[in-house]
Curated annotation (Swiss-Prot):
Activated by light-induced dephosphorylation. Inhibited by dark-induced phosphorylation. Both reactions are catalyzed by PDRP1. Formation of phosphoenolpyruvate. May be involved in regulating the flux of carbon into starch and fatty acids of seeds and in the remobilization of nitrogen reserves in senescing leaves. This is Pyruvate, phosphate dikinase 1, chloroplastic. Transmembrane segments: none annotated. The gene is PPDK. Gene3D superfamilies: 1.20.80.30, ATP-grasp fold, A domain (3.30.1490.20), ATP-grasp fold, B domain (3.30.470.20), Phosphoenolpyruvate-binding domains (3.20.20.60), Phosphohistidine domain (3.50.30.10), Pyruvate Phosphate Dikinase, domain 2 (1.10.189.10). Phosphorylation of Thr-543 in the dark inactivates the enzyme. Dephosphorylation upon light stimulation reactivates the enzyme. Belongs to the PEP-utilizing enzyme family. Its main location: plastid. Its EC number is 2.7.9.1. The active site is at H545 (tele-phosphohistidine intermediate), C922 (proton donor). GO terms for cellular component: chloroplast; chloroplast stroma; cytosol. It comes from Arabidopsis thaliana (Mouse-ear cress).
């Protein structure tokens, strides 16, 4: 079917760096003929674009059957990048073919990732089937036009189609020289399985006869039935299951297991059955006009951009600002032409471990969707090496070329048609956290990338995956292993079994941990996959939909577990004689593929030498310091182990909740007189001092920022029925029940988060601030006596006026003076405040006269700026996100336009009043990568986050520098 109109003979083009100097004259050597060519000349392919330097070995092609066959081995050494077409703003259709293209890898926003990389592969001389890309702007215009092709676009598409037809000497709808097409989507950001694909477009009752005459009946009718299935599902909205049902019945009737065992006559009959599905489902015939098929397929791909599953994937992954999807239309090449054909997907390195070894799968006599969709369980690449050694050797060489060119680990789709290799797609491969770090470190060692580039190769979320738990004792569950599948995404997961995506989401919303068990996953399952702790599938391979999506999210996944049978209707999982019901617990080891009965204990992971090396590079580049929020000595030790440069927030109230301390706290709350309160605080003093000593010891030589008591006092009271609370407090404190009730009523507030808390407690009860300050200074002096370098910083919370801060600073400094007199020596310390009330940000210059440092409490600052109660926001925030009123949860991702501007203003005003002012942030946003970037640009000195998010913040701070 496919052939080249002009045979190309071997040609070598040699260029020099002087090409772009002066007249740009260079020499070509073609079959011994020397010619001088200037930049104004056009190359033989009709292109104005020249390679920069190096050598290209083109290949000789000949016509053979329906495929393109290689007579001389292809090699591509140099890496030219084509200049974008002159009027890109108006151009909506871009063509590409081997050795030439109208696009390049830098045009992803316009051509989508797939289209840009196809153009790039073609331009560097790899064997890419000729095709065209319809731009993302055309998709945007289609949506604006009410889901109609914009004016003039169809004519541009037909012009591009003529390019494909001329290139290969075949025509759409011509039975004597049939051209079949693939129609694929491709957004600027990879979204696996989110968009729809149609293969073998152009077949009808007449064309299939012509194709059969050239390529054999079995191949022709196998291609036709696949097209009917895909076109019906993607374009016409007929469920794939209706076609699958016909196929399964046919295999059952013929007594065969695989599709490949069906004869040509069987497939002919199946084609007619598939046509009847159209009539039954839609009440109309299958559209036989190939150009109408093409138009409908393009519209279907554009429509898929706005499908529920695509919207959900973008929402989950916070993908915004894209124009739409591009459409890639290519000449078909076939992996289902017999035992010398096949299709595969590979990564140039292992995406799970990062090992420098090709990692992928191959199916003999199959089409690409069979591998990617997980419909058939494939074999590893050694199968291809055995059966097609020449094609395999060329594939290995192409992988090396692409890694050198893109300077990254690549995800590649390819097809072999009668021993001829075709490259169908390449993109930067998704990888696990472990894989990302090893690949980055190895590529620096190999000289492929600089350290600054390597830092950009690891996403902050990758480090989050590395900090996920593993099984505590894998040897302890060996007897409970009930099945084993493919280890598609590493890590460990424990949860209750559910069988549908909807159930996974529902159970997750109730606070349950679930394992989603499916025969195979589809893009419609992404919501449930995201909600699940792990994913287990009976079918599919290491590059199936489930595997790719799970790896991208860092979720444990076992695929192709053929020992299990999923009965979704009865909600049971069958493994031999074993039945596991919905809701029962299983565990999964995604690193080994083991499915384990019951709940297994999890343990935190250990940091690898590669990670330590990588993080040392990040630390050397970043300017922003990273501190940790830690409330106990154990937290402080973990923080330091993870690279924290100090404690940015130590919440003293968390020290009060121990069983031996809470009674004293409650006595203090019930106290009526200052003397009663002091008596209770005297009991708490040694506890606080001991905790501070442990934290100072753990953070020897690093600053420790301690926040004075912040929450409303009612949070320390027991929960439950009021009568029971009163009785319990009366027994604990020795206060009469009526007095307890009276005290509780006085503590009751309509809006406690804006009430009696923070510095208001210390101002009303100065003895509370005195006790905490004494505990800090006594602990600091004691540790200093033991040779520990202590750097205490005391932080006053919820300040809204300079007078509030001034009052508390006076109390603290008086206590310090007393303690230092008692101890006979001093300790250097600072007093500062949290900026969490908008008014404090607005008058930061006045606040800075009293404060030696600012720490933005972004949780409360966000709450008060938006007027959203964190405790109640769940009632409406999901609606706001769904309707696009907000793009992100402002309590997770900093609102840079509002809250962010307050932070910038306060920083500038504060430093204007006190140039030495130290400024940081200690809210949850300190661990959010996108927010960390903003804080660095705003000129903050540090961020503080939970101990286990410290590595993520360290990397995010470095990536701001190299962005």
């Amino acid at each position: 079917m496919l052939y080249i109109r002009k045979k190309m003979t071997s040609m070598i083009v040699k260029t020099t760096p002087e090409l772009f100097k002066g007249n740009g004259v260079f020499r070509t050597d073609h079959l011994g003929e020397n010619r001088m060519v200037s930049r104004s000349n056009r190359l033989g392919d009709g292109s104005n674009r020249f390679p920069r330097t190096g050598t290209i070995h083109c290949q000789r092609l000949s016509i053979a059957k329906t495929g393109l066959h290689r007579e001389t081995k292809a090699r591509a050494i140099l890496s030219p990048v084509s200049d974008p077409a002159a009027s890109i703003a108006q151009k909506r259709v871009f063509t590409f073919g081997k050795g030439r293209s109208e696009g390049n890898k830098g045009m992803k926003s316009l051509l989508g990732g797939k289209g840009a990389n196809l153009a790039e592969m073609a331009s560097i001389g790899l064997s890419v089937p000729p095709g065209l890309t319809i731009s993302t702007e055309a998709c945007q215009q289609y949506q604006i036009a009410g889901k109609k092709l914009p004016e003039g676009l169809w004519e541009e598409i037909l012009e591009g189609l003529s390019f494909i037809e001329r290139d290969i000497g075949a025509s759409l709808a011509d039975p004597s020289k049939p051209l079949l097409l693939s129609v694929r989507s491709g957004a600027a950001i990879s979204m696996p399985g989110m968009m729809d694909t149609v293969l073998n477009l152009g077949l009808n009752d007449q064309v299939v006869v012509g194709l059969a005459a050239k390529s054999g009946e079995r191949f022709a009718y196998d291609s036709f039935r696949r097209f009917l299935d895909m076109f019906g599902d993607v374009v016409m909205g007929i469920p794939h299951a209706k076609f699958e049902e016909k196929l399964e019945r046919m295999k059952e009737r013929k007594g065969v297991k695989n599709d490949t065992d069906l004869s040509a006559a069987d497939l002919k009959e199946l084609v007619e059955q598939y046509k009847s599905v159209y009539l039954e489902a839609k009440g109309q015939e299958f559209p036989s006009d190939p150009k109408k098929q093409l138009e409908l397929a393009i519209e279907a791909v554009f429509d898929s951009w706005d499908s529920p599953r695509a919207n959900k994937y973008r929402s989950i992954n916070q993908i915004t600002g894209l124009k739409g999807t591009a459409v890639n239309i290519q000449c078909m090449v076939f992996g289902n032409m017999g035992d010398t054909s096949g299709t595969g997907v590979l990564f140039t390195r292992n995406p799970s471990t990062g090992e420098k070894k090709l990692y992928g799968e191959f199916l003999v006599n199959a089409q690409g969707e069979d591998v990617v969709a997980g419909i058939r369980t494939p074999e590893d690449l050694d199968t291809m090496k055995r059966f097609m050694p020449e094609a395999y050797a060329e594939l290995v060489e192409n992988c090396n070329i692409l890694e050198r060119h893109y300077k990254d680990m690549m995800d590649i789709e390819f097809t072999v048609q009668e021993e001829r290799l075709w490259m169908l797609q390449c993109r930067a491969g998704k990888r696990t956290g472990k894989g990302a770090v090893k690949i980055a470190v190895d590529m620096v060692g190999e000289g492929l990338v600089e350290k600054s580039s390597a830092i950009k190769m690891v996403e902050p979320q990758h480090l989050d995956q590395l900090l996920h738990p593993q099984f505590h004792d894998p040897s302890g569950y060996r007897e409970k292993v009930v099945a084993k599948g493919l280890p598609a995404s590493p890590g460990a997961a424990v949860g209750q079994v559910v069988f549908t995506a909807e159930e996974a989401e529902a159970w997750h919303s109730q606070g349950k941990t679930v394992i989603l068990v499916r025969t195979e996953t589809s893009p419609d399952d992404v919501g449930g996959m995201h909600a699940a702790e792990g994913i287990l599938t009976a079918r599919g391979g290491m590059t199936s939909h489930a595997a790719v999506v799970a790896r991208g999210w860092g979720k444990c996944c076992i695929a192709g577990c053929s020992e299990i049978r999923v009965d979704e209707n009865h909600k049971v999982l069958l493994i031999g004689d074993l039945t596991i019901n919905e809701g029962e617990w299983i565990s999964m080891n995604g690193s080994t593929g083991e499915v384990i009965l019951g709940k297994q204990a999890l343990a935190p992971p250990a940091l690898s030498p590669d990670l330590e090396t990588f993080m040392s590079w990040a630390d050397a580049i970043r300017r922003l310091k990273v501190m940790a929020n830690a409330d106990t000595p154990e937290d402080a030790i973990a923080a330091r182990k993870n690279g924290a440069q100090g404690i940015g927030l130590c919440r003293t109230e968390h020290m009060f909740f121990g069983a031996d301390r809470i009674k004293a706290v409650r006595k203090m709350i019930m106290a009526v007189t200052t003397e009663q309160r002091k008596a209770s605080l005297d009991i708490l003093l040694p506890y606080q001092r001991s905790d501070f000593e442990g934290i100072f010891r753990a953070m020897d030589g690093l600053p420790v920022t301690i926040r004075l008591l912040d929450p409303p006092l009612h949070e320390f009271l027991p929960e439950g029925d009021l009568d029971n609370i009163v009785h319990e407090l009366a027994e604990e404190t020795g206060v009469k029940e009526d007095e307890v009730l009276s005290r509780i009523e006085k503590l009751s507030e309509v809006n406690p988060m804006l009430g009696f808390r923070g510095c208001r407690l210390g101002i009303s009860y100065p003895e509370l601030t005195e006790m905490q300050a004494r505990a800090i200074f006594e602990a600091a002096a004691s540790m200093q006596d033991q040779g520990v370098t202590v750097i205490p910083e005391i932080m006053v919370p919820l300040v809204g006026t300079p007078q509030e801060l001034g009052h508390q600073v006076d109390v603290i400094r008086k206590v310090a003076k007393k303690v230092f007199a008692e101890k006979g020596h001093t300790v250097s310390y600072k007093v500062g405040t949290m900026i969490e009330i908008p008014r404090a940000a607005l008058i930061a210059d006045e606040i800075a006269k009293e404060a030696e440092f600012f720490s933005f409490g972004t949780n409360d600052l966000t709450q008060m700026t938006f007027g959203y109660s964190r405790d109640d926001v769940g009632k409406f925030l999901p609606i706001y996100l769904a309707k696009g009123i907000l793009q992100h949860d402002p309590f997770e991702v900093l609102d840079q336009q509002g809250v962010g501007q307050l932070i910038k203003m306060a920083t500038e005003k504060g430093r204007a009043a006190r140039p030495s002012l130290k400024v940081g942030i200690c809210g949850e946003h300190g661990g959010d990568p996108s927010s960390v970037g903003f804080f660095a640009e705003a000129g903050l000195d540090y961020v503080s986050c939970s101990p286990f998010r410290v590595p993520i913040a360290r990397l995010a701070a470095a990536q701001v520098v190299v962005a």
